[in-house]
UniProtKB/Swiss-Prot annotation:
Record localization: Cell membrane; Nucleus inner membrane; Endoplasmic reticulum
Name of the protein in question: Transmembrane protein 120A
Pfam families: TMEM120A-B
Tissue spec: Expressed in nociceptors.
UniProt keyword annotation of Lipoprotein present: no
PANTHER family on file: ION CHANNEL TACAN, TRANSMEMBRANE PROTEIN INDUCED BY TUMOR NECROSIS FACTOR ALPHA
Membrane topology: Multi-pass membrane protein
Any further remark recorded for this protein: TACAN means movement in Farsi.
Protein family according to the UniProt entry: Belongs to the TMEM120 family.
Transmembrane spans: 133-152, 159-177, 191-209, 219-240, 271-294, 305-330
Subunit architecture: Homodimer. Forms heterooligomer with TMEM120B. Interacts with PKD2; TMEM120A inhibits PKD2 channel activity through the physical association of PKD2 with TMEM120A. Interacts (via C-terminal domain) with STING1; regulates the trafficking of STING1 from the ER to the ER-Golgi intermediate compartment to elicit antiviral effects.
Annotated keywords: Cell membrane, Endoplasmic reticulum, Immunity, Innate immunity, Membrane, Nucleus, Transmembrane, Transmembrane helix
Amino acid sequence: MQPPPPGPLGDCLRDWEDLQQDFQNIQETHRLYRLKLEELTKLQNNCTSSITRQKKRLQELALALKKCKPSLPAEAEGAAQELENQMKERQGLFFDMEAYLPKKNGLYLSLVLGNVNVTLLSKQAKFAYKDEYEKFKLYLTIILILISFTCRFLLNSRVTDAAFNFLLVWYYCTLTIRESILINNGSRIKGWWVFHHYVSTFLSGVMLTWPDGLMYQKFRNQFLSFSMYQSFVQFLQYYYQSGCLYRLRALGERHTMDLTVEGFQSWMWRGLTFLLPFLFFGHFWQLFNALTLFNLAQDPQCKEWQVLMCGFPFLLLFLGNFFTTLRVVHHKFHSQRHGSKKD
């Protein structure tokens, strides 16, 4: 090989030789990466199929145990109960395992994203995504408080109201997508607290299309005041729930992927019961909104279909939020009373 010519060209050629050597190392590293990736895919497929087989056999075993339990002698009941407990524990272990394996997206994610794999493969990535979701909720809640306050007390314009409602539609749509991804990654979000975001998306979309007029102006201030109060309560919930979750995770009593929610769950009983009056007041305000809209719909001057279409979601939100919260409170009172009787 000829020596490089002197001067700037020689320096460039020497740099190119160094780059060539580095590139060969990169090629080898990339080749190993692709091999490991293929091995990982095979392991994922094997693990998924093994878990599927185990779950199917567990279901068959649970059915057989259920059939034979009535005819068991008294001395065998303890062993049957122990077996049931172990099977439930196994189901929980499978849930944790599947959080690290690729899975098919649900209907909603398939419609929005297609068949893209949204499973994050490391604890750090899962926790970082969950943390980013929590921060997103916090920042948007603060923004919603400020905008609803501005629309309620400073500006009376259908344009700014429409911008506020558009922000609500975008916020709730984004929440539903992010929550679906978090569920795919092991977050245990209860059914209603996910579904009520779909209802809120529909409600905000209808509010966005409601034209300015007499009926809209009659309901406008009430809706903006409610939105301001709701965002304030959501801010309180995030602030106190995040601290409570941090303590419970440190004690090993909560899962690392558990989230703050816009409601009340059993783990909040210790230290967060002071939020209940705020929540119940908000629930009954939703009922008041529904009744107001149903009353407006009976007005002879009411021509807009949006009046009734907003009333029904508010009623559904009240029923879902109120009875879900009430069920949690009733369950905790019942379990505490049962525990005190045992003592």
